[in-house]
Amino acid sequence: MNILVVNDDGYQAEGLAILVKALAPFGNVYVSAPKTHQSAKSHAITIKNRIETFVSVPIFGSTATLVVDGTPSDAVRLGLKVFDIDFDLVVSGINYGANIAKDIMYSGTVAAAFEAKILGVDAIAMSAPNTNLPYLYDETIKLFDELIETKLYEYDGILNINFPKETYQRPKGVKITTQGLRLQHAEFVKSEKPDIFHIKGSIINYQEHPESDVVAFDDGYVSITPLKLDRTDYSKIKDILETEN
């Protein structure tokens, strides 16, 4: 099995190291990762500038490593091109910080998985509130034992996996979840220097669906949320057509 690992925290990130080592028993693990931290880059790709890459000494026990001076989605595209082999799976992560609810709209980790799917390769995004969690390596192996055996990722979307909040010593289990509603109120705050702003956010609490990734995260469960590229609101189309008729 050939597996490509990407991330948005950069090629030196601890979460990347854990993921590569955890996937090693399942096949040949290749790495294509950004040179620098790329959080919240979402699905950005580089279109006007050239992208510098270099083949590194294989890191974390990988078969081969490519470092990309670009976005997470750039790293996916270039990894698939430069290595030029048939990959069975792309895994993006392990991200430092959860990617639940609205987070997926901004997440470079989730976008990298979607980019792989656009290019025809099955993909999984994986995130944790903290990559220093003592159980993370063992639980990641346990998850992939099940995922690879069942091939749950083989469909026309991706799987978005999140480990629970770090107040739990270990996950209570795994839940298949929906995307939650948790939103943030974000505003730009002026800094001490003139014309310089930084973003400040606060959580807006909603009544979450009990089967959402937010509830699973808060209750101590690993969440697996199937996500699709198609964002069409079919119920709204139906409403419009019924109104017109």
Predicted ranges, named:
Residues 3, 14-86:
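A cross-family phosphate/adenosyl-ligand binding-site feature
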Residues 5-12, 103-104:
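Short, glycine-rich nucleotide/cofactor-binding loops
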Residues 9-17, 194, 207:
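Short acidic, Gly/Ser-rich segments with clustered Asp/Glu that frequently serve as metal-coordination loops
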Residues 79-84, 113-122:
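Alpha-helix C-terminal capping segments
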Residues 89:
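Short, Asp-centered acidic motifs that coordinate Mg2+ and/or phosphate
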Residues 98-107:
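Glycine/threonine-rich flexible loop motifs
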Residues 117-137:
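Glycine-rich phosphate/pyrophosphate-binding loops
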Residues 137-245:
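Electrostatically charged, flexible surface regions
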